[in-house]
C-alpha cells in the first residue's frame, strides 16, 4: 500500500469507529449504573456535589460534564449516550499522536484504530453513560504527553510538564484510576529516566494539591458512613481465573463466553507462536523503535493490571474491574499491530490474518444483533402499566430482589414527570395517561415475600432468587392467584414481574 493511500486510510477507519458507536446506541434502555449517572446529573449543582460526595467512589468531573451535556441537548437516550461515544472517539487523537512519536507507519496506526473500532469491550463502554471512556481519554492523553516530556522536542521541558500536570488533574477528577497512571509514570522515570524525576515530583505535588478539595469533600461522607465497604463489598477479589478472563476481554473475545477455555488456550498458543517468531526474527524487532515502543506500552499495560490485581488482593475491599482499565485496549492493539507488521514470518502473518478475520466477523455479527448485556427494564414498566390501564386505584409493586426496584422506580418516576429519560421501548402516544398510570404505582424496596400483601399488587424478582419455591408458588400456596408473568433477560440474568390477587 502506497504512503498516499495509507494517509487516507485513517479518516476512513475513524468514520467507521464513530459509526459503530452511534449504531444501536439507543437500542436498549439504561441499566442501573447509567440511571445513577443521569439521576445525579439531574440535581442542582449543589445537590450534585452532595450526591457524588455520598457515593464517594467516583470523582465528580463526569457528572458535571453530563449535566452540561443534558442542558445542551436534552435527556433522550440517544443524546446522553453520545457523550461517552464522544470521549471514546476523541481518545483516538492522543493514541494517533503517540503512534507518530513512536514513528509507526500510517498503516499500523490505521489498523490499530480499525481494530479498536469493532472491539466489543471498547464498544460496550463507548455506549455506556459512565465515566470510563472519559478516563480512557484522559489516561491516553497523559501517556502521550508524558512520552513527549521525556523525548526531545520543540517545547521546553517546563512547558511540557506543565501540560502533563493539567492533563493529570483532569484525569484524577475523572476517576481514581487516574492516580494509577500517574504512579506508573513516576516509576517509569525511576526505572529508565531518572533525570526527569524532579520535574515529575513537582507535577505530582500540584496534582495532589488540586485534588485536596475533593479529598476533603468526599472524606466527610466516607467518615460519616464508616468507610467505603458499603460501596465496594459487591466487588469480588480477583483470582487467577479472573485475571485470565481480563486478558480474554482485552483481546476482544469477552463477548463470546461460549468460547470459554478455548479462547484462553488459543490466545496462549498465539502468544507462544508470536514469541517464537519474534525470537527467530529478533534482529528485525530491534530495528527502528519497536523494542522501545514495546517496552513503553507493555510497561503501562502489565503495570496497570498488576497494580490493580495486587491491590484488590491485599486491600480489605477489591477495586478490580475490567471497566476501569478500558484505556488499555488501544495500547495493547497498537503493540500487537506493530509486531504483526514488523515480523515477516509467514506463519504469524497467516495465523494472525485468519484469527483477525474470524474475530471481526464474530464481533460485527454480535454487534448487529444488539447488546445482550443490559436488561430492558423499561419494557417491564410499560407492560405493567398496560395491564393496569383500566385500574383506577393505586397498586403496590413489591421488589423481593435487592436491585430490581431501582430501575422500575426510575422509569415510573420518569413517566410521572412526563420525560423519556433512559427509555428505548416505544412509548404509547397518550403520555398523560401513561403519567397518571405511573403515579398510581407505589414501589416497595427489597421486601421479604411475606410482606407482599393486599387485594391486588405486583411482585418482582430476578434469577438471583435464592428460594426453592418461586415467589409465584409461595403466593399461590398462601391462597392468592398469580397472573401471567412478564420476563426480560440479558446475557447473565432474568427479571420477572407478575400481578397477584388475594382474598381480603
Cite the ranges covered by each PLM segment.
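Membrane-proximal helix-loop-helix interfaces that form the catalytic/acceptor-binding platform
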Residues: 5-153, 157-503
